[in-house]
A protein has these predicted regions:
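A small/polar active-site loop signature that marks catalytic segments
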Residues: 1-98
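C-terminal soluble interaction/assembly domains
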Residues: 50, 62-152
Length: 152
């Protein structure tokens, strides 16, 4: 008989939580899980390479992508606007990847963007991922169009 058991939310729900609340520890762990799944090793370097390889295999332009870690906290990481847009577009259209798009923070409502864009007719139409370091603040995501469709 079992001495103990552990259960958790499905990974897509954990990823949605990570994105919505900018949980850097979970971000790093998702990089590690990617590397381990790909049998790439067990280090920050193999984590970042596994993530970059996975993005490229999905047809996402990774030109100029530099990842110092998977959390985004270590100085030296760079990502292009093209890479961010292609990731958002894929997340909106690629089956299970839609959980990543749906898990983004909603300005005025939930997550790290809950105190941004809190009033007005556009409230609730944006889903965004916030980011900030000492000298940088960023925002990437998508917006629902009034007449249908989504823009990244």
């Amino acid at each position: 008989s079992a001495l103990a058991s552990v259960s958790s939310a499905p990974l897509n729900e954990v990823m949605a939580f990570m994105l919505r609340h900018s949980d850097n520890t979970l971000a790093q762990l998702f990089g590690r899980l990617t590397a381990l799944k790909r049998q790439a090793g067990n280090s920050i370097k193999t984590d970042t390479q596994a993530v970059a390889d996975t993005l490229a295999e999905q047809g996402i332009d990774t030109s100029g992508l530099q990842m110092a870690d998977c959390s985004g906290l270590t100085p030296g990481s760079k990502v292009s606007v093209t890479t961010l847009i292609e990731m958002q577009e894929r997340n909106l259209t690629a089956g299970i990847a839609t959980a990543a798009a749906e898990g983004l923070s909603i300005p005025g409502l939930v997550g790290t963007a809950r105190n941004r864009i809190v009033t007005g007719p556009d409230n609730g139409l944006f889903r965004v991922k916030t980011g900030s370091l000492d000298a940088v603040t960023s925002l990437a995501g998508n917006v629902s169009r009034v007449k249908g469709g989504v823009l990244s």
